[in-house]
């Protein structure tokens, strides 16, 4: 949960590093919480050596299977030369689109191997991944403005999506409140 707190307060992905078996299974609650609240986390778990996977070895568990429902994506690293690209991809998946947790499971024999580090390829961000993208059609936005005008007691109820959308979204919301004078309320996830 500390990594989740870090991610919530910093806007950067939190990182979790745990051992195999019980270390990995003890992350399920935090991963589920982060998944439900769209908090970017990268969880790196240990695993028994590759040749022991599936043999009920000491502290072996199906980490990727257990965490599939509570992560955006997970990986079992079977080749040391793919580790760097998987880690770069993990951070990308955790922080793009709807943010959320991902998991990288690294068997013990892979942890002790030497491999070649490969820098990530330059990824051109899609419009909206770093800046706010307005998807509304002009007529829909005009309809919302008209509803604001006609409302006798307008109130803005905003959620965690504003926080997750970044500082620019928060700034725009503050400007809207300042311009309109509308009262605003948020659930705990939207307080930032």
PLM regions: where:
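N-terminal alpha/beta PP-like core and its mobile active-site loop of ThDP/TPP-dependent enzymes
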Residues: 1-192
